[in-house]
Amino acid sequence: MVKIGLEVHVHITALKTKLFCSCPSDYTGKDPNTVTCPVCLGLPGAIPVLNENAVKYGILTALALNCQIAEKLIFDRKHYFYPDMSKNYQISQYDGPGSMAIAKDGYIKLNDKIIRIRRINIEEDPAKIVYPTGSILTSKYTLLDYNRSGTPLLEIVTEPDLRSAKEARFFLEKLRSILEHLGVCDCGIEGAMKADVNISVKGGERVEVKNVGSPKDVEDAINYEIARQRASILQGIKIERETRHWDNERRVTVPLRTKETEEDYRYFPDPDLPPYSITPELIEKFKREMPELPDQRAERFVKQYNVTPYQAQVLVNEKALADLFEEITNNYKNYAKVANLLINDYMRWLNENNITVTQSKAKANHIIELFEYLDSGLISIKIVKELLPEMILTGKTPGQLIKEKGMTNIKDENYLERIIDEVLNEEKEAVEKAKRDPKVVNYLVGMVMKKTGKRADPQMTVEIIKKKLGLT
């Protein structure tokens, strides 16, 4: 039996400043160690002051994850010695005597299964450790960038209810969608959502794999670790409790250090941060501000757009995709056609090429224009599928690409008849088969498409071939 638990660290990208100081939380493109102050550098005497908007996003997340919300918020010092934390403790939260996380005892429904949420913490992010000449294992020296130090995080801790790598990936994808719909986190930003993965195989101790970047990486790390632990158990090697690192390039886990226990961190309440009261009125206020969540949106999609429950779930799995779908369907009413294109062609190509919806340059009005060309008969569905990747990469409109490539459908009947006659003369065996089995006409249509660079109008081509073969 396999048990898997996750500790998910989510940057509250909605906040413009850090958790306990006024430094900007967005340090993208800034020189190292330039977005700092005495508080986020951990200098003696610097006093942290809570960014109250972090409480708002913590409560919204707790409500969305069906958690019990604490009456007061208490911050703790989590002590450890590591270069990324200059004051030798992290301001976090702990669910123990004298301590209190912002929320606990929640759940996410994953299909028909309940995945329990143990607790949600608000905490600060450590500094970034940079390995200039290799990886954590091979770099000749290490650099520290404190721009990240003090940026606000939510830590979402599950119970060990997950049983497979695929289930863990699905859980993270659903959690990501919830957080995006709440406006808590733009999970498309690199490093905005990471997970520590705890894995135990029957017969062995729990092993933690730290800082795994994406749901797909989590799936791969778990599969590797399960196989490694099972192989060790079969060889009579005892699985020790330890922390491992996910090597993203080699796609393996490697030992990092012996796993600490909770006692090793010596949690105690931070004397510089007084308890923060969370009143019932405050919770009710945020309940009224709750946006539509993915499950609610999926139900609406089924009713409003008559898509299948599966299609609705795929669409809302990524907020940007659901937004794109609704932007298109505001002006183009063939909902099924839009859903099919986005799920089967658009998203498949994005996933195969590691591009996100927000990175795509194909805008809603471009895709509407593409459907209009298709509906008018100027282009075929094959041309649609050829144009879509270029629209995604370049941002060019279908009209621009069609003009550049001369890709409009050929509707000149005399020209089509001439090409079809050539095909019928060259494919005499297929012609005889088509007279007995009309399905073979599709093969002849394909040969015409080949000769015309896929530009022959499909409907006209079928009609002319059938007429010439006496099948109409």
UniProtKB/Swiss-Prot annotation:
Protein name according to UniProt: Aspartyl/glutamyl-tRNA(Asn/Gln) amidotransferase subunit B
Cited function: Allows the formation of correctly charged Asn-tRNA(Asn) or Gln-tRNA(Gln) through the transamidation of misacylated Asp-tRNA(Asn) or Glu-tRNA(Gln) in organisms which lack either or both of asparaginyl-tRNA or glutaminyl-tRNA synthetases. The reaction takes place in the presence of glutamine and ATP through an activated phospho-Asp-tRNA(Asn) or phospho-Glu-tRNA(Gln).
Keywords associated with the record: ATP-binding, Ligase, Nucleotide-binding, Protein biosynthesis
Biological-process GO terms, alphabetical: glutaminyl-tRNAGln biosynthesis via transamidation; translation
Species per Swiss-Prot/TrEMBL record: Saccharolobus solfataricus (strain ATCC 35092 / DSM 1617 / JCM 11322 / P2) (Sulfolobus solfataricus)
InterPro entries listed in its UniProt record: Asn/Gln-tRNA_amidoTrfase_suB/E, Asn/Gln-tRNA_Trfase_suB/E_cat, Asn/Gln_amidotransferase, Asn/Gln_tRNA_amidoTrase-B-like, GatB, GatB_C_1, GatB_Yqey_C_2, Gln-tRNA_amidoTrfase_suB_CS
The enzyme's E.C. designation: 6.3.5.-
One Pfam family this sequence matches: GatB_N
Family matches, as PROSITE patterns: GATB (PS01234)
Single GO term (MF): ATP binding
Organism ancestry: Archaea, Thermoproteota, Thermoprotei, Sulfolobales, Sulfolobaceae
Description of how the protein assembles with itself and partners: Heterotrimer of A, B and C subunits.
Domain of life: Archaea
Catalytic activity: L-glutamyl-tRNA(Gln) + L-glutamine + ATP + H2O = L-glutaminyl-tRNA(Gln) + L-glutamate + ADP + phosphate + H(+); L-aspartyl-tRNA(Asn) + L-glutamine + ATP + H2O = L-asparaginyl-tRNA(Asn) + L-glutamate + ADP + phosphate + 2 H(+)
The family this protein is said to belong to: Belongs to the GatB/GatE family. GatB subfamily.
SMART domains in the cross-refs: GatB_Yqey
